[in-house]
């Protein structure tokens, strides 16, 4: 029997990424794990609906044996079985992030016995999670360069607190994974500001993109009033397309925060990214660790080595025979993986 990997959910930044990475890697490698202190670093520790849905989705996709899969649980034992391609549908039952559930199971389905379609219902545009736009426009084009055939479609927008959104991904097994090197982003080719509005006055989006335009005069502007009762909700993004990759920075409207303040938050993140020669933004760096580890080679530059990034690296190295280096440079960090 494979050895059980013991993980401390309180290590590093103590968030849900430790659990999601462990589930992905356990399915792929066949190694069981047990985790204590799940999300110990959060205000509400233990499994929330989003995390529980990820656990149950992983369980269904590989026929795992699992203990501790209940709301609020801070202990989990997961023993995987073989990964099975097919049609899957999961509902979070709240505005929890569809994208984080998808990012838990999709890496395993790169190694399935056939093609798959996974549909998840919940939130598609959430605080502290990659949006559907980020997955489609930023992450998946980079995965394609690594030899991964995966396409996500946004079915319906869903915002906190109502949820009600949905996204689906079609994924094919990968014959092999290629490494990816992102040292320089190259010249900026195009910048696009987009405000999404669901049951929110149109002038809010107009003010948001106007504020972004003051920071980025060259940006194209787009205000989208969503139909179909998917609100209330408001998401503002700035997409920066460069020669080597696309980045996307987002913020969300909340009651009591002005449209201008939301836009200035996006502008601050984007300006900080552009002020550094690093190719990859802080959040994208987190999303690249697992696919690069599975490829066994690759490198990228990032302005800041966050606790989230370092924690994810530590979890990956428990499951895979790879080693990451994180070397300080004059303008940030060079992150490399080798087997």
Swiss-Prot record:
It comes from the Bacteria. ATP binds at residues 103, 283-287. One of its GO terms (molecular function) is RNA-3'-phosphate cyclase activity. Keywords: ATP-binding, Cytoplasm, Ligase, Nucleotide-binding. GO terms for biological process: RNA processing. It holds the Pfam family RTC. It catalyses: a 3'-end 3'-phospho-ribonucleotide-RNA + ATP = a 3'-end 2',3'-cyclophospho-ribonucleotide-RNA + AMP + diphosphate. SUPFAM superfamilies: EPT/RTPC-like, RNA 3'-terminal phosphate cyclase, RPTC, insert domain. The keyword Cytoplasm applies. Its EC number is 6.5.1.4. The keyword S-adenosyl-L-methionine does not apply. The active site is at 308 (tele-amp-histidine intermediate). InterPro entries: RNA3'-term_phos_cycl_insert, RNA3'_phos_cyclase_dom, RNA3'_phos_cyclase_dom_sf, RNA3'_term_phos_cyc, RNA3'_term_phos_cyc_type_1, RNA3'P_cycl/enolpyr_Trfase_a/b, RPTC_insert. One of its GO terms (cellular component) is cytoplasm. It is found in: Cytoplasm. Catalyzes the conversion of 3'-phosphate to a 2',3'-cyclic phosphodiester at the end of RNA. The mechanism of action of the enzyme occurs in 3 steps: (A) adenylation of the enzyme by ATP; (B) transfer of adenylate to an RNA-N3'P to produce RNA-N3'PP5'A; (C) and attack of the adjacent 2'-hydroxyl on the 3'-phosphorus in the diester linkage to produce the cyclic end product. The biological role of this enzyme is unknown but it is likely to function in some aspects of cellular RNA processing. Belongs to the RNA 3'-terminal cyclase family. Type 1 subfamily. This is RNA 3'-terminal phosphate cyclase. It comes from Salmonella typhimurium (strain LT2 / SGSC1412 / ATCC 700720). The lineage of its organism: Bacteria, Pseudomonadati, Pseudomonadota, Gammaproteobacteria, Enterobacterales.
């Amino acid at each position: 029997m494979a050895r059980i990997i013991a993980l401390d959910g309180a290590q590093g930044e103590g968030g849900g990424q430790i659990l999601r990475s462990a589930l992905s890697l356990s399915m792929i490698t066949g190694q069981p794990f047990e985790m204590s202190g799940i999300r110990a670093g959060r205000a509400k520790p233990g499994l929330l609906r989003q995390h529980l849905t990820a656990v149950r989705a992983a369980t269904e996709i590989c026929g795992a044996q699992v203990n501790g899969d209940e709301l609020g649980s801070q202990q989990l034992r997961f023993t995987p079985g073989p990964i099975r391609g097919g049609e899957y549908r999961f509902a979070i039952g709240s505005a929890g992030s569809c994208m984080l559930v998808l990012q838990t199971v999709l890496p395993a389905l790169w190694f399935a016995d056939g093609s798959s379609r996974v549909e998840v219902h919940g939130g598609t545009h959430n605080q502290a999670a990659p949006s559907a736009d980020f997955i489609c426009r930023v992450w998946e084009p980079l995965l394609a360069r690594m030899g991964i055939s995966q396409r996500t479609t946004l079915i319906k927008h869903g915002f906190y607190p109502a949820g009600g959104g949905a996204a689906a991904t079609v994924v094919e097994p990968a014959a092999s994974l290629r490494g990816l090197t992102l040292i320089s982003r190259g010249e900026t080719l195009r910048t696009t500001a987009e405000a999404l509005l669901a049951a929110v006055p149109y002038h809010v989006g107009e003010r948001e993109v106007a504020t972004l335009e003051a920071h980025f005069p060259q940006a194209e502007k787009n205000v989208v009033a969503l139909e179909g009762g998917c609100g209330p909700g408001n998401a503002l993004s700035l997409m920066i397309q460069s020669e080597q990759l696309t980045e996307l920075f987002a913020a969300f409207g909340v009651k009591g925060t002005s449209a201008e303040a939301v836009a200035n938050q996006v502008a601050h993140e984007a300006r900080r990214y552009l002020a550094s020669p690093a190719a990859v933004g802080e959040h994208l760096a987190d999303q690249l660790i697992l696919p690069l580890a599975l490829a066994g080679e690759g490198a990228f530059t990032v302005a800041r080595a966050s606790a989230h990034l370092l924690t994810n690296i530590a979890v990956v190295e428990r499951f895979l025979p790879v080693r990451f280096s994180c070397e300080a440079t004059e303008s940030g960090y060079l992150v490399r993986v080798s087997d």
